[in-house]
From Swiss-Prot:
Name of the protein this chain belongs to: Transcriptional regulatory protein CseB
SUPFAM superfamilies: C-terminal effector domain of the bipartite response regulators (SSF46894), CheY-like (SSF52172)
Modified residues (4-aspartylphosphate): D55
Residue ranges occupied by any Response regulatory domain in the UniProt entry: 6-119
Alphabetical list of CDD domains matching this protein: REC_OmpR, trans_reg_C
Keywords, comma-separated and alphabetical: Cytoplasm, DNA-binding, Phosphoprotein, Transcription, Transcription regulation, Two-component regulatory system
DNA-binding region positions on the chain: 141-235
Length: 235
């Protein structure tokens, strides 16, 4: 029997927490559900789940702070849950290291689809230390060099001026997408499709925040913004 995917779900609303836990368990997930951020952090450290769903407004340790604490310790995928798609909390969550977000109220099927999409691009097999899935757009084997930046496409490692750069799997997939076509402008919609596995329109803020996070790690001038079109990696 295949090992169940373990989901950490942190939500303070009892009705939402219990209903969502039941829906996820019916879909085959193992779920640890916690009502606040501090107990959520303890559960994360004790169980090392495969993915974390964090409500932004949980008490004790809010969802954004919890995401930041998790990201300090792990590259496990994180999805933020927010009652408002236009909330600054969404951007703060992405800046803290979240990989995606879902707006409340949400349909259970939509949430499950988003979870599975995130796990696919993380190459989920046996837990949070799994490497990103193979991507047909990624360059074939070897080390790519762009100035002081080196990308090992087989070892999934990045160095800047000889020093290792720690990237999350989503950041790595984004960099691989850029490096597969250096100098070519990639639209936000194309990046959502290729990196986030969206077969439909998504929130381009997800792309913008991840590009900015990537820039802080590989160099602000390595990725250019082409206003009105998208982004490109300097060849």
């Amino acid at each position: 029997m295949a090992e169940q995917t373990h989901v950490l779900f942190v939500e303070d609303d009892d009705v939402i927490r219990e209903a969502t836990q039941l829906a996820l368990e019916r879909d085959g997930f193992a779920v640890t559900a916690m009502p606040d951020g501090l107990s959520g952090l303890e559960a994360f450290r004790a169980n090392r789940p495969d993915i974390a769903l964090l409500d932004v407004m949980v008490p004790g340790l809010d969802g954004v702070s919890l995401c930041r604490r998790i990201r300090d310790e792990s590259t496990v995928p994180v999805i933020m849950l927010s009652a408002r798609a236009d909330s600054i909390d969404v951007v703060l969550g992405l800046e803290a290291g979240a990989d995606d977000y879902v707006t409340k109220p949400f349909d259970g099927a939509v949430l499950v689809a988003r979870i599975r999409a995130v796990l696919r691009r993380f190459g989920h097999a046996s837990g949070p230390n799994s490497r990103p899935a193979e991507d047909s757009s990624a360059p074939d084997g070897g080390v790519l060099t762009f100035g002081e930046l080196e990308i090992d496409t087989e070892g999934m490692e990045v160095r800047r001026s000889g020093q290792p750069v720690a990237l999350t799997p989503t950041e790595m997939r984004l960099l691989l997408e850029f490096s597969s076509a250096p100098g070519t402008v990639l639209s936000r919609d194309k990046l959502l499709e290729r990196v986030w596995d969206y077969g439909w329109g998504g929130d381009t803020r997800v792309v913008d925040v991840h590009v900015q996070r990537l820039r802080t790690k590989i160099g602000q001038d390595r990725i250019d913004t082409v206003r009105g079109f998208g982004y490109k990696l300097k060849a």
